[in-house]
Amino acid sequence: MNEILKGSVKKSISGINKQIVIFFHGYGADGSDLISLSDAFSKILPNAIFYSPNAPQKCEMGGIGYQWFPIKQNNDGSLDLNAKNEILNSVKLINRYIDEIELDTGISSKNFILVGFSQGTMIVLETLLSREKKISAVVGFSGGFLNVSNKVSKINLDTQILLVHGDEDNVVPMEMTKMAKKNLNILGYFVNTYFSKGLGHGISLDGLAESTKFLKKLNI
């Protein structure tokens, strides 16, 4: 049992464990928010165990949800120092969480897929760039790339990345994904993108289908 981050777990439908998929929820949600995506992903990854942890902090806006980092900005729109520090702290916890899942399951992180939504996408990309062990693929919905860690994980330069975004998102504008692709390309990462027409801040059926098609091609 992983004690670093608590959340939901769903066993592989085949009973044969070869891959790990970890979902990272958005701001103010919890691990149960995304675990239902395992129904779609398990059709192409029948040997995958699915994890969906709660973020480490209770949401600053109240309620029962969690956050990977606080949404605090300076007057110029940049993240304040506390937010940056909390991002780095969450990344450290996630890396420890991944390491513990490796130990618990005997499955190498080279067979791990990280899937994020909104703030979860942002923290997944930060984790990818800081991780010193291989990750197979990243799928990010409705997020962006903050580059707080200011690192480049050379071992993960060939990690497959797909970023999906709604073209009518007024919470995290789709320009955030376009900028993420540009900045990740500059750092040496190749990024696939897909934009869902008429979609606001969410995950559409066509976006989900695109992500499963993307993962199926990888033949993990």
Indicate where each model-derived feature is located.
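Serine-hydrolase catalytic machinery in alpha/beta-hydrolase-like enzymes
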Residues: 5-107
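Conserved alpha/beta-hydrolase "nucleophile elbow" surrounding the catalytic nucleophile
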Residues: 25-27, 115-117, 166
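Alpha/beta-hydrolase fold nucleophile elbow
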Residues: 107-116
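Gly/Ala-rich beta-loop-alpha elbow adjacent to hydrolase catalytic centers
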Residues: 116-120, 124
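A conserved short beta-strand
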Residues: 133-145
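C-terminal catalytic histidine-bearing segment of alpha/beta-hydrolase fold enzymes
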Residues: 162, 178-220
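Short beta-strand/loop motif that positions the catalytic acidic residue
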Residues: 162-165, 169
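Conserved alpha/beta-hydrolase "acid-adjacent" motif
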Residues: 170-176
